[in-house]
Amino acid sequence: MGLMAVLMLPLLLLGISGLLFIYQEASRLWSKSAVQNKVVVITDAISGLGKECARVFHAGGARLVLCGKNWEGLESLYATLTSVADPSKTFTPKLVLLDLSDISCVQDVAKEVLDCYGCVDILINNASVKVKGPAHKISLELDKKIMDANYFGPITLTKVLLPNMISRRTGQIVLVNNIQAKFGIPFRTAYAASKHAVMGFFDCLRAEVEEYDVVVSTVSPTFIRSYRASPEQRNWETSICKFFCRKLAYGVHPVEVAEEVMRTVRRKKQEVFMANPVPKAAVFIRTFFPEFFFAVVACGVKEKLNVPEEG
């Protein structure tokens, strides 16, 4: 019996691996069929996450509209996508210059997209601008710039494209947000405020457009790290507050977020949080034990201000 168990273990592991492989392949093919021939608009397509979303959706056969502030960056992304794609299974992406912080140009860009394809099936609001610093040292001009890029830009583009989706009674709007839409982190007042605002808008919009079969989805990771980012090493392990902040800052890779965006589109999920247990616990504590949460965060700020810089 012991020998039989030893022999069965490798076979069991092999069988599980085979089933996982089949599931992943089936999921990949299913994802492709969900976006094939669909007109997909991706904002800030030249960012790390934007590039990965473009890669995933282009491979799935979507008719991409890639928006970005830098034309050279868009052309570089275009060259990368077309160099590895099968022309018989993919469509040539359309490139559009778009700076969401410049609200005046958003309507013209949306009109250009609709004139080209006649519709938009999926809108991925990915653009985001960050700023970090004490609230009293952040100028109102910078506060407004953050709100334009993170709030007014996405909702303006959404409002212009939404009537087309409503009239066709189909479409999906995906907001790539941040877990800071659920609770604020010190020294990120403008960024957190913009994320709270845009989450509130799309939460309300979701209920408004459900009767038209338009899906509104939000994907909120803790932090989208760069390809070269690595966790910062500090002697904070003994502090609960700083342990929380360190865990929160690890974030997720753009590839992971792009794959989750694709799954969200395929399954028409309404809300997704991409976070390890510590940030999820923070959301829970903030909701049910707010006074304790505020005390812990304030304690963390005091400790951070009292820790001398290294080097």
UniProtKB/Swiss-Prot annotation:
Subcellular locations according to the entry: Sarcoplasmic reticulum membrane
One Gene Ontology term, aspect cellular component: longitudinal sarcoplasmic reticulum
What is the reaction catalyzed?
Answer: all-trans-retinol + NAD(+) = all-trans-retinal + NADH + H(+)
Q: What induces it?
A: Induced by all-trans-retinoic acid (at transcriptional level).
Going by the entry's taxonomy, the superkingdom of the source organism is recorded as Eukaryota
Q: Which GO terms describe its molecular function?
A: all-trans-retinol dehydrogenase (NAD+) activity
The Gene Ontology biological process terms listed for this entry are:
D-glucose import; intracellular calcium ion homeostasis; regulation of release of sequestered calcium ion into cytosol by sarcoplasmic reticulum
Enzyme Commission code: 1.1.1.105
Top-level EC class:
oxidoreductase
Purpose:
NADH-dependent oxidoreductase which catalyzes the oxidation of all-trans-retinol to all-trans-retinal. Plays a role in the regulation of cardiac and skeletal muscle metabolic functions. Maintains Ca(2+) intracellular homeostasis by repressing Ca(2+) release from the sarcoplasmic reticulum (SR) in myotubes, possibly through local alternations in NAD/NADH or retinol/retinal. Also plays a role in Ca(2+) homeostasis by controlling Ca(2+) overload in the cytosol and the SR in myotubes.
Q: Write out the similarity annotation.
A: Belongs to the short-chain dehydrogenases/reductases (SDR) family.
Protein name per Swiss-Prot or TrEMBL? Dehydrogenase/reductase SDR family member 7C
Q: Which organism is it from?
A: Mus musculus (Mouse)
